[in-house]
């Protein structure tokens, strides 16, 4: 079974051509002006053997793209600009290689002599090269997967087939697998946090470069190769002549369009393809009796979510109107896609009743069509699809106000629900299947039917989110104006609960129709009304979840239930109106360390509320809880954040199992490790036992969306790993229950306590640390950059008032990445381990504790993933580069005190990590990632050096320091460094 499944998976791969490798004397020169050329013949290369041989095609692509960029740089800016870029690159390499102080002085002199225009050109060159290198790397990942498949290699970790084979090897039955899918729900949720640093125009150009680069892996004639190079040169030129930065801050509508572009390039086709492949693999690995190997359709367990247009936490520009606009644009995108696919099917399904029979239902569907052309009298499939198109066009007009791109043949009634459209397509599918047309049904038609199951008329569910303080203020005003309670906010928690529960049972509303409420209260009420409106218009799946940021008490949840009641979305179950129920699930978001620790108690109180069991029943006996990785990290540090999340998840699982309620966890993961980032596959597999249970939602944030989903093939792989990991974590949970788990957890608790102390002492208790952070990172410049529609800080960032506590976690992490310390991803671990070992006393006891840590690394996925992510962060960090940022702090005493502590902790962390893993080199167990990161340094480091120089100029206060070109240079460097690190916030 295993071999046949692997063979069939291999047969689906695209063949690649073999070409001779480049001469061994050619060494990679990953620079914007790399002069080492590469043959312009077909670059389809099947490599085997050494890592260097496997990476040869990647090196060739990087050299090739670097040469094109160098040519464009010479052409557009002159030879002198090209030589300047090369000199800076070579000097930065010397500085990196051995911390060469002479190289540092040369860099200082060189960078200071650059004019503002020269600086901008140099920054742009290195930034664009980082983007081009990322494209080459993505293409190489795709290439290597095809090579593995062609070679008949075993399925790769993270693949669906590997997950299914593992489940089969563990003795899982086909029935158990099907029960898993029946109850499963997996939802990636796109968000629009202010880490999206790339313009859509740049992304579009990069997609075309990626397509052309992939084209070079196919057999091309000489003329085709020449044309390919010409087009690539044109698009690189287009990049150079396209403004990289936005001149104005993004509006929410822009963020909506950016997100929708990923549906058009990736999700609409790749998600149905993912289902198809999964169904085929299930049929192969778990064949059903009498099914003859035919795939059985799976339920629509994998869907998409979005915060864009519904996330009001800290963003005053998200209103009821933006929610309506987001829903309308989503419907427009999916309906337009359906219309195009139906039109294409009409051209494809040309079967004639003179040659083949059709079903009675298909004939009836054709008869209902407004198409009565005699030319198509014997083509019922075409007539039926013309009718479907007409109804869908009417639906599009009704839901979006837009006409279909192609006019319908005649009038037809609109579909009221997506299920009606799906039923019509099923008639077509069944008729084809019954009359020797299975192959026709299995192509575009089957994918379209699956898309309707997944996307409906809404495309993606939009979550609503707001901070709990706003809800409290809104409810307080409603109660005061209604004469119910004049000082709600001053009540004790117990009194708030009593009042809110009483109001939820009252049939009357608090809202007065002719009263003018405050702007905030009116806006909040409008959001709830808009939610009810779009649910009625586009279907209930358009808005299903309401996230409450900073949930600290049970009343925070009850307030949102009351606001739903005011909008007609809560049924209290009295007066014969049926059982209680919420239209939109109320979901707490626990963010800080203290909130995480209180989460089990709050959820226990919620589940114990009188009558809440009826609400749960209406929700399918499920309740979701969201966990915040970002704020917990900023609050308590990397190690403590991860450990508190782990403990909270276990406590919630135990609570929900005891209550007989299904728990679904929503992971608010960011792009950086400090915000829960890192490889999704390992992150899901390392979740505590029993916490996944077939259901998971997780955020996909910032420009991480671009790196994961801009390339359709990369996007498909990322979607696949989410499903595979969820399947494995649910069906093979014993892998995360190693022997000695209690001992491991006790050790983690001790480490967490020590790490928490070290982190809090540095960040919140060190005098002047706030000033050091603002001086040595580009945090204020990031706040000024037009990254997203949401402000970077919850409060104005003036020097006297600003506090670390008030800074959002996203720019906090973004800033540490820019200065190459990436502190939120590692600080505190080294001293925590050292202190725990020292507490053991004797050398023998210390050795025993170190042995425990080694076993934890080898046997416990949670700890192994934690160390793996930290290893990756440390490999991207650079103390030499960071030391140059430290010089931006003018207070010498403060600078030396803080940076010396950070440096010492960094060195100690590297040492203890090596002692635990047995690896002296960073990423020794992941050489592909190690080489990838190493390849970026020659163009990443110069951007950091340039950024430091630009920050010096900008902050100097000298004449011209606030020049627009200096500001633009800083912003360009931020963009390029984020691209080079392949994550931002």
Swiss-Prot record:
GO biological process terms held by the UniProt record: carbon fixation; oxaloacetate metabolic process; tricarboxylic acid cycle
Record's Gene Ontology CC terms?
cytosol
Residues of the region (Disordered) are 1-55
EC no. given is 4.1.1.31
Enzyme class, UniProt record, top EC level: lyase
Q: Which reaction does it catalyse?
A: oxaloacetate + phosphate = phosphoenolpyruvate + hydrogencarbonate
**Essential cofactor(s):** Mg(2+)
Q: According to the UniProt entry, which residue ranges have a biased composition of type Low complexity? A: 1-17
Taxonomic superkingdom: Bacteria
Could you tell me which Pfam families the record lists for this protein?
PEPcase (PF00311)
- UniProt entry keywords in alphabetical sequence: Carbon dioxide fixation, Lyase, Magnesium
An example of a GO molecular function for this protein is: magnesium ion binding
Q: Quote the catalytic residue positions.
A: 193, 634
Q: Which family, according to the similarity comment?
A: Belongs to the PEPCase type 1 family.
Protein's job? Forms oxaloacetate, a four-carbon dicarboxylic acid source for the tricarboxylic acid cycle.
**PANTHER family, per database record:** PHOSPHOENOLPYRUVATE CARBOXYLASE (PTHR30523:SF6)
Name of the protein in question = Phosphoenolpyruvate carboxylase
């Amino acid at each position: 079974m295993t071999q046949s499944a692997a063979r069939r998976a291999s047969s689906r791969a695209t063949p690649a051509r073999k070409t001779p490798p480049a001469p061994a004397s050619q060494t990679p020169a990953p620079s914007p002006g790399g002069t080492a050329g590469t043959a312009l013949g077909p670059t389809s290369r099947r490599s085997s053997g050494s890592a260097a041989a496997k990476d040869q095609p990647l090196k060739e692509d990087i050299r090739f793209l670097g040469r094109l960029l160098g040519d464009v740089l010479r052409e557009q800016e002159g030879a002198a600009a090209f030589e300047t870029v090369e000199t800076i690159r070579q000097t930065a390499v010397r500085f990196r290689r051995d911390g060469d102080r002479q190289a540092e002085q040369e860099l200082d002199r060189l960078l200071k002599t650059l004019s503002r225009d020269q600086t901008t050109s140099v920054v742009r060159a290195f930034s664009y090269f980082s983007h081009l290198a990322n494209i080459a790397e993505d293409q190489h990942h795709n290439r290597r997967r095809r090579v593995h498949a062609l070679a008949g290699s075993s399925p790769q970790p993270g693949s669906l087939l590997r997950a299914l084979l593992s489940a089969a090897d563990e003795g899982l039955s086909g029935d158990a697998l099907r029960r898993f899918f029946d109850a499963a729900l997996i939802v990636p949720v796109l968000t629009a946090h202010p880490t999206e640093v790339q313009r859509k125009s740049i992304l579009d150009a990069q997609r075309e470069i990626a397509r052309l680069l992939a084209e070079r892996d196919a057999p091309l004639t000489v003329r085709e190769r020449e044309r390919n190079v010409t087009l690539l040169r044109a698009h690189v030129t287009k990049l150079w002549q396209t403004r990289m930065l936005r001149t104005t801050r993004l509006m929410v509508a822009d963020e909506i369009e950016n997100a929708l572009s990923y549906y058009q390039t990736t999700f609409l086709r790749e998600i149905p393809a993912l289902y198809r492949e999964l169904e085929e693999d299930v049929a192969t690995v778990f064949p059903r009796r009498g099914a003859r190997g035919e795939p059985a359709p799976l339920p629509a367990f994998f869907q998409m979510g979005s915060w864009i247009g519904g996330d009001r936490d800290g963003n005053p520009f998200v209103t009821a109107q933006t929610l309506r606009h987001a829903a309308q644009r989503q419907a427009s995108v999916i309906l337009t896609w359906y219309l195009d696919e139906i039109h294409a099917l009409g051209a494809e399904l040309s079967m004639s009743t003179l040659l083949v029979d059709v079903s009675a239902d298909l004939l009836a569907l054709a008869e209902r069509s407004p198409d009565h052309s005699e030319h198509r009298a014997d083509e019922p499939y075409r007539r039926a699809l013309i009718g479907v198109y007409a109804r869908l066009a009417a639906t599009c007009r009704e839901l979006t106000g837009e006409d279909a791109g192609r006019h319908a043949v005649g009038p037809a009634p609109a579909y009221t629900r997506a299920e009606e459209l799906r039923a019509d397509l099923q008639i077509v599918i069944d008729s084809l299947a019954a009359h020797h047309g299975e192959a026709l049904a299995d192509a575009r038609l089957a994918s379209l039917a699956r898309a309707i199951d997944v996307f409906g008329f809404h495309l993606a569910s939009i979550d609503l989110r707001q901070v709990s303080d706003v809800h409290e203020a809104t409810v307080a005003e409603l109660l005061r104006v209604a004469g119910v309670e004049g000082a709600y906010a001053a009540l004790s928690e117990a009194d708030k609960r009593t009042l809110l529960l009483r109001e939820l049972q009252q049939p009357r509303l608090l809202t007065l129709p002719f009263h003018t409420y405050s702007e905030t209260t009116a806006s909040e009420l409008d959001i709830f009304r808009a939610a009810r409106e779009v649910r009625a218009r586009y279907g209930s799946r358009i808005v299903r979840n309401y996230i409450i940021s900073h949930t600290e008490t049970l009343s925070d949840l009850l307030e949102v239930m009351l606001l739903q009641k005011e909008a007609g979305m809560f049924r209290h179950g009295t007066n014969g109106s049926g059982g209680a129920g919420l239209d939109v699930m109320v979901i707490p978001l626990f963010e800080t360390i203290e909130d995480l620790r209180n989460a089990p108690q709050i959820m226990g109180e919620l589940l114990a509320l009188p009558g809440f069991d009826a609400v749960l029943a209406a929700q399918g006996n499920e309740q979701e809880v969201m966990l915040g990785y970002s704020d917990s990290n900023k609050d308590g540090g990397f190690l403590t954040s991860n450990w508190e999340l782990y403990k909270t998840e276990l406590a919630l699982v135990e609570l929900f199992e005891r209550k007989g309620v299904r728990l679904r966890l929503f992971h608010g993961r960011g792009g950086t490790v400090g915000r829960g980032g890192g490889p999704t596959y390992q992150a899901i597999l390392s979740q505590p036992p029993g916490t996944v249970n077939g259901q998971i939602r997780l955020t996909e944030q910032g420009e991480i969306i671009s790196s994961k989903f801009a390339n359709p093939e990369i996007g498909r792989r990322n979607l696949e790993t989410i499903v595979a990991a969820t399947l494995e974590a649910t069906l093979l949970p014993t892998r995360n229950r190693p022997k000695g788990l209690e001992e491991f957890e006790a050790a983690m608790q001790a480490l967490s306590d020590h790490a928490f102390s070290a982190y809090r002492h540095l960040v919140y208790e060190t005098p002047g640390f706030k000033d050091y952070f603002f001086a040595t990172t580009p945090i204020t410049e990031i706040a000024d950059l037009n990254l997203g529609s949401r402000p970077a800080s919850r409060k104005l960032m003036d020097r006297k008032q600003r506090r670390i506590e008030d800074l959002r976690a996203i720019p906090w992490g973004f800033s540490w990445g820019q200065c190459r310390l990436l502190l939120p991803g590692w600080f505190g671990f080294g001293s925590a381990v050292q202190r725990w070992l020292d507490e053991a006393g004797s050398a023998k006891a210390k050795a025993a504790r170190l042995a425990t840590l080694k076993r934890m690394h080898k046997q416990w996925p949670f700890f192994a993933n934690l160390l793996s992510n930290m290893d990756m962060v440390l490999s991207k960090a650079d103390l030499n580069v960071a030391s140059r940022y430290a010089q931006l702090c003018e207070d010498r005493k403060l600078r030396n005190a803080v940076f010396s502590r950070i440096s010492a902790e960094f060195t100690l962390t590297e040492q203890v990590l090596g002692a635990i893993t047995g690896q002296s080199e960073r990423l020794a167990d992941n050489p592909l990632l190690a080489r990838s990161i190493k390849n970026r340094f020659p163009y990443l480091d110069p951007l950091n050096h340039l950024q430091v120089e630009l920050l010096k100029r900008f902050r100097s206060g000298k004449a011209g320091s606030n020049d627009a070109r200096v500001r633009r240079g800083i912003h360009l460097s931020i963009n390029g460094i984020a691209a080079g690190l392949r994550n931002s916030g």
